[in-house]
């Protein structure tokens, strides 16, 4: 059953919980023992190895459910559980970078831009070339500059996060970095990265990926979100229109996050 971020109420209890992408770990492998359960050798994932949220009911492991902050509806909370969490983990991997580039201004980036601004960082947003609506959206959320991914930012970046699954963005992001900067690839998939000259990586620039999340990431981010406060922009679809929602996402026609809403009797 698809659906990798879920908000619902526990049957028989008046308790609302969030179910993130990481749905189970063995707790015994070397990664789990060292606080890196996101890299668990035997991890299982919501909507992939485990039943997801495209349903009225789903069975989940209570240990991996997250308490949701007050003040968020189910529609508002759902994007925080994947787009928000993977963005949060990516942001933490940039350290204290003051000038932050976000490549692909969609579900994750529009959430993390708010966190970055809250922390006093300067955000530079990169959208599909010619996407003036997306660039205006980024500026509304506090980006000091917004342009196409084919453009150079007006100043060097200390770090960049690539949310778009486009390998061609890697050398572009590296080329925009100051010395010692880092590029974080936040996606679970990316097209092939083209060859690039070593000089783009030289001077202690770093290129790394992000894999999944930990429960600690979830607890930290969901505690921080209402302090910012993070407000996810969502477009809701009823469950029976799931295929329409997926097509809209593939076509880049969603601003923010698409969320499926299950009718309750």
Question: Where are the predicted features?
Answer:
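Glycine-rich beta-strand-centered segment in the early N-terminal region that forms part
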Residues: 1-30, 64, 69-72
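Residue-level marker of beta-strand positions
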Residues: 5, 15-16, 31, 57, ...
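Structural detector of well-ordered beta-strand residues that form the stable sheet scaffold
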Residues: 7, 18, 66, 101, ...
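Mid-domain Rossmann-like dinucleotide-binding core that forms the NAD(H)/NADP(H) cofactor-binding site
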Residues: 16, 70-153
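Cysteine-cluster motifs in flexible loop/terminal segments that predominantly coordinate metals
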Residues: 20-66
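Glycine-rich cofactor phosphate-binding loops and adjacent beta1-alpha1 units
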Residues: 124, 132-206
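C-terminal hydrophobic helical "lid"/dimerization subdomain
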Residues: 171, 215-265
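Short strand-turn motif at the edge of the Rossmann-like AdoMet-binding core
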Residues: 186-190, 210-213, 237
